[in-house]
């Protein structure tokens, strides 16, 4: 493809025919679709035929994106082409495409992850009545994201930005008949509207400043205005903050992060796509695309890094006590996105994009593996997310789903930062750069790396080690037919927040006659013992997923193993470069402008040793607390060996319980928003309604009623004689003239 840049405009439009054709078919032939349900096997095969062209078209885009990346690595310059849509004397609105290293990186990321998710979804969603609708939404999602990354101006970005938000709304609420899913998609939509409104205001503000929406013109004009001090700096900072607000909402940064855990109500494949390469990546992409704009405003760079470090720590602490496997991974995504924002705020453009790449493949692997786990658990507990996604009911899955276990373990180790897996290289680069930026931020970032290792191995141990805990909850297995249709995924129950959450969620609290209780905070607590191991009953067990679901996981496993190699230096003409650096050259990087091979190698090994040590400490702590020591022993009292009562131990327990209550209840942030914002807005609406009905309507109705009674009084007073009416008329005219005379003269 010698001149592939010239045909890059087709990238967003290649997958577009699929949602159009599926949508037309569902609208024009709804009756035929319902009749096909009478023939389940034929219907399933017919529907799955749509998966092949979907995957094929996205594969074409992937090949095209790879060619663009190769051209960028070989030194191709930025390519832009625009078509004028609206031309006026003072205004010209243009559409086009913009090809640079960032575009090629994002295109490869979207297409590769998208292809694997589509292959996986073919089997995962095969028994769902909404199979075709799901694939239509997924294709539209990929199209919207590809359009976003190839946009050449802010208006075009905003259009595709809204399309990405709409697709996420449709996919999060895919099972819209479930109240939890319907509420989750509304929450995501409303939360993102806040950021989108800020983004729109920021776009209009910068157009008012520069008179252009085009990226290259915008950057050049704005830099000249800043250099010549021809613009009000406070107004510029406000507009840049509004632009950043869009990225905060889309990438689930504090304080607009609350939609991300609830987004797990959607099907697991879409969770993988949202968290790896589409919606949450859009916010990082926006900041990276507008990086030349933000970099000349120091206050905005400080704000970006501050929001990033807060999100890093908050996401990690909220993941500590989650029992839902997908929500635990969701908070993990939030924390890792915080690392990317932190890197961008520090000026480490390369490290941020590198972590975006490595995290995408690792997190896609983890979500697809969690989907395989959920799929296997549904055969036992039924189609209920409260059970199939709850790690309390899992355990011991290592021997039942060995391939999934290996995939999940590799993804977990990568996210923990264990070499030579993908996330080790990118996270270590961010951690190293943090020392150059701020020691306080560095301490928080390094400490959170240990927390990441802890909560990720907590998820792994609760899921795969020990015994299958659902058996001790006395759930019987459920057989499923060869074809079944899922409309309502279980009945919705009211969620009760457990305010007495404890460190060991899988253990039961019992009291034997010969045991003495211990006291914490004035409350008597029972000692922890393991029970129910004597329960004898035959159960069904989880089974490994089909090859269609395992194949994408294995390919993503290979990506997780080897994608970090793009940052390994190679020698070219006496210069030590790597593929990522050649791809991003001459992108801006404030840090590491001068390098020395020996010093860099020494610093790398020193930082790597420190980061791996912190990760290993987190893993060891997770093993200490969650490794099932009771696997071969019945009714073992853990407190006899683990707990030695004393003042220091009681204080430590209080701190642990406080942290876990904070984490389990999402830091009480959702509760705060519910009380302060939701109830406050509803109270204001009720007050406005009362004022409108009682005051505004009261005045209007009062005037009408008063006029009515005055008219009735005059009517009866006059006795229905015309002469009396004429007299009153003349009196009123005289009074009016007298008043007018005194007013005028």
From Swiss-Prot:
Its EC number is 7.1.1.-. It is found in: Plastid, Chloroplast thylakoid membrane. It is a multi-pass membrane protein. Signal peptide: none annotated. Keywords: Chloroplast, Membrane, NAD, NADP, Plastid, Plastoquinone, Quinone, Thylakoid, Translocase, Transmembrane, Transmembrane helix, Transport. Pfam families: Proton_antipo_C (PF01010), Proton_antipo_M (PF00361), Proton_antipo_N (PF00662). One of its GO terms (cellular component) is chloroplast thylakoid membrane. GO terms for molecular function: NADH dehydrogenase (ubiquinone) activity; quinone binding. GO terms for biological process: ATP synthesis coupled electron transport; electron transport coupled proton transport. The chain crosses the membrane at residues 9-29, 50-70, 99-119, 135-155, 157-177, 194-214, 229-249, 268-288, 290-310, 337-357, 364-384, 406-426, 435-455, 550-570, 610-630, 724-744. NDH shuttles electrons from NAD(P)H:plastoquinone, via FMN and iron-sulfur (Fe-S) centers, to quinones in the photosynthetic chain and possibly in a chloroplast respiratory chain. The immediate electron acceptor for the enzyme in this species is believed to be plastoquinone. Couples the redox reaction to proton translocation, and thus conserves the redox energy in a proton gradient. Belongs to the complex I subunit 5 family. NDH is composed of at least 16 different subunits, 5 of which are encoded in the nucleus. This is NAD(P)H-quinone oxidoreductase subunit 5, chloroplastic. The gene is ndhF.
